[in-house]
From Swiss-Prot:
Name of the featured protein: Nucleotide-binding protein Rfer_2692
Residues spanning the membrane: none
MF terms (GO), sorted A to Z: nucleotide binding
Alphabetical list of PANTHER family matching this protein: UPF0234 PROTEIN YAJQ
Keywords, sorted A to Z: Nucleotide-binding
Origin species: Albidiferax ferrireducens (strain ATCC BAA-621 / DSM 15236 / T118)
S-S bonds: none
């Protein structure tokens, strides 16, 4: 029975390279000289550190540009709150989304059921598997998901006949 998986995964290698390039640019830019501006990647969290909110937004803009150059969708980034740390410093944690959240998976599953396309959707941990009798039905389900779900970058893999 033909099937495919719907996933939401960023290339962590490209994210790492974008963070490294952002670090290089921060160290060479004149407006960041003598400031504690920094960016750091640990697991799937990017930590921005700076003097003020304005500096954090500049670092974030640099990061977004570097990610875009590496073809990583910026919708993978989930911004956290700006926190004050010792002195005048502030930090912000940005999480890199990896996997489809349960709520979104249920929304996609409901969308497929309501569309009356003859396919079944099953939630499997951080991905959604869609199976159907015909390849055309699966392609129709893909088109429906691409059209209606825009808040996160979804991709399709593991297409089997």
């Amino acid at each position: 029975m033909p099937s495919f998986d719907t996933v939401c995964e960023a290339s962590m290698v490209d994210v790492k390279h974008a963070v490294e390039n952002t670090t290089k640019e921060i160290t060479t830019r004149f407006d960041f000289k003598g400031t504690p501006a920094a960016i750091e990647l640990k697991d799937k969290e990017i930590t921005l550190t700076g003097d003020a909110d304005f500096q954090l937004s500049q670092i974030e803009d640099i990061l977004r540009n570097k990610l875009t150059k590496r073809s990583v969708d910026v919708r993978f980034l989930d911004k956290g709150e700006v926190q004050k740390i010792g002195g005048d410093k502030v930090k912000q944690v940005i999480k890199v989304r990896n996997g489809i959240e349960t709520e979104l998976a249920k929304k996609i599953q409901r969308l497929i059921k309501d569309s009356k396309i003859k396919v079944q959707a099953a939630i499997q941990e951080s991905k959604l598997r869609v199976t159907g009798a015909k390849r055309d039905d699966l392609q129709a389900a893909m088109a429906l998901i691409k059209k209606d779900i825009t808040e996160v970058p979804l991709s399709f893999d593991n297409f089997r006949d």
